[in-house]
C-alpha cells in the first residue's frame, strides 16, 4: 500500500482513478521555510520534505512506500504557488493569458523497508502549459469561481481550468498533481 503525504484532493483522485491502493497522511511541512532559486529543485525539496516527515511517523507495516509531491508554475522567471487571494489570481492570469508556463511537480518516493521491490527516489516532471488568451471578464469569472485559489499556478486542469488551457506539452496528470506514468515506472506491476 502507498501512503500519500499530501492534502491534495486532486492527487488522491488520480490515485483512486488509477486503482493504486493508498492512504493519505498530511505531512504538516512548513512549505514557506523551504527555498531554492530553481523550480525543479524546489519542488523536489518540498516533495522530499513531505515524504520524509510522513515516513518518520510511520507505524503501519502494510505501507510499502510513502509518496510526497509538490507543484509550482514557473512563468517568466517567477515561481507561482497558490495565489494568496483573488486579486493576486487575477493579476497572474492577466500576465499568463496567451503565454506558455512550465508546471513542475516534484515526486519523492521512499520505500518503507528493504524487503520491498520499491527503490527510494526523487524526480521532477515538467509539463509546458499554454494558457488561453482570456478576456478580463473571463478572468474575473474564473477567479470568482474560487477554483484558482486552491491550485499551484492558479488553475485546475481537471476542473473549470480545463477550459482556460489551450495546449499541453508533456504529462497531463502531472499538471493535476502527480505523474501517473512516472509512478507506474517506480512501482512494481503487482502493487
Curated annotation (Swiss-Prot):
UniProt-listed CDD domains: Maf
Protein keywords: Cytoplasm, Hydrolase, Nucleotide metabolism
SUPFAM superfamilies: ITPase-like
GO BP, sorted A to Z: nucleotide metabolic process
Named cofactor requirement(s): a divalent metal cation
Annotated catalysed reactions: a ribonucleoside 5'-triphosphate + H2O = a ribonucleoside 5'-phosphate + diphosphate + H(+); a 2'-deoxyribonucleoside 5'-triphosphate + H2O = a 2'-deoxyribonucleoside 5'-phosphate + diphosphate + H(+)
GO cellular component: cytoplasm
Main location: cytoplasm
EC number: 3.6.1.9
InterPro entries the record matches: ITPase-like_fam (IPR029001), Maf-like (IPR003697)
Top EC category: hydrolase
Catalytic residue list: 70 (proton acceptor)
Cell compartments where the protein resides: Cytoplasm
Similarity-based family: Belongs to the Maf family.
Name of the molecule in the record: Nucleoside triphosphate pyrophosphatase
Taxonomic source organism: Synechococcus sp. (strain WH7803)
Phylogenetic lineage: Bacteria, Bacillati, Cyanobacteriota, Cyanophyceae, Synechococcales
